[in-house]
Amino acid sequence: MNNTTKYAVTALAAALGISALAGCGGEDDESAGGEGSKSSKTVTLVSHDSFNASDAVLKAFTKETGYKIKVLKSGDAGAALNQEILTKGSPRGDVFFGADNTLLSRALDNGLFTPYEAKGLDRVAADTRLDADKHRVTPVDTGDICVNYDKKYFADKKLDPPKTFDDLLKPAYKNLLVTENAATSSPGLGFLLGTVATRGEDGYQDYWKKLKDNGVKVVDGWEQAYNDEFSGSAGGRKAKADRPLVVSYASSPPVEVLYADPQPTEAPTGVATGTCFRQIEFAGLLDGAKNEAGGKALLDFLISKRFQEDMPLNMFVNPVVKDAKLPELFKKFGATVDKPATVAPEQIAENREQWVRSWSSLVVK
């Protein structure tokens, strides 16, 4: 997509002076090449660069099914999807993971997947099953793109942080927000889509004109926005950043706590939960998979309670399985987003380029 929290976490960890969690797949993990599963005992997962899982969870899959997972990492989600479209019918693996709701229609329109109803799908939240009638893809995780705020800044100024998109237009928040370019960054695109969802196709342009007049700053990507411009992040504090509002993720506060040394008792950042856009990531059985049985077993596993409970601290996303428990770090420091903004995947596919062009002409010309 697509630069979700998972893609950002390595940069955030670097800013905090430590290494991010290692990639999964062990000696079978690859970043290029591949011709699908080489044997019936290997199942190949094609993914964006930031798929991650604990070794114990991967070993449990092998013990339960007899299949060993090979992870073929292929850049960000958009680049990975493009490669699968180019190899349609002769896929590089058995399962593709990483198409989110901003890319879903493109993947489905290109006929990349063989329908399969994963075991345990009835335990998956109904609002994430965007292809429920055909089962071409299986929901795996959700995440929310939201404005984050620097708690210290607002406490020092005795100013309440913003809560909604409308709040960001108020004079009190002039010259405080930094966001990412919607044409080059997934969180930037998600924030734009959030304004389309809340203001409508007839109102989002007027919103952005007002936001520009209120001093919004636009930079190329998440790393620059969060680690260089945002005063609430570890990197921003080192850089003496002066923007206390940034477009990031609802899971950014737990990440700040997890990678801090020593760990604080309170997250230094908060989330404006009325500014969030919901992302849903999917996996699907690739049409022409060499190990279809292994691919089906892997899809079943991706929505198992074991894998779902492993995801939050490895990929910094939320589980879609209703009985999966969040780790205490997420419960204590994460934000609960009850009513995220959403846009139908087919509407995104039809209008994304037009929305981004209009946004660019208004904001970055």
List PLM regions with ranges.
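Ligand-binding pocket segment of bilobal, Venus flytrap-like solute-binding proteins
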Residues: 187, 194-274
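Early extracytoplasmic/lumenal segment of secretory-pathway proteins
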Residues: 25-27, 35-106, 365
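A structural signal for short loop-to-beta-strand junctions that line the ligand-binding cleft
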Residues: 91-96, 114-149, 166, 176-182
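Mature extracytoplasmic/periplasmic domains
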Residues: 283-342
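Pocket-flanking alpha-helical
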Residues: 55-59, 77-113, 122-133, 228, ...
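Short beta-strand->loop
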Residues: 114-122, 136-138, 166, 244, ...
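Periplasmic solute-binding protein
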Residues: 101-112, 132-160, 188-196, 278-284
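C-terminal motif of bacterial Sec signal peptides marking the signal peptidase cleavage site
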Residues: 19-23
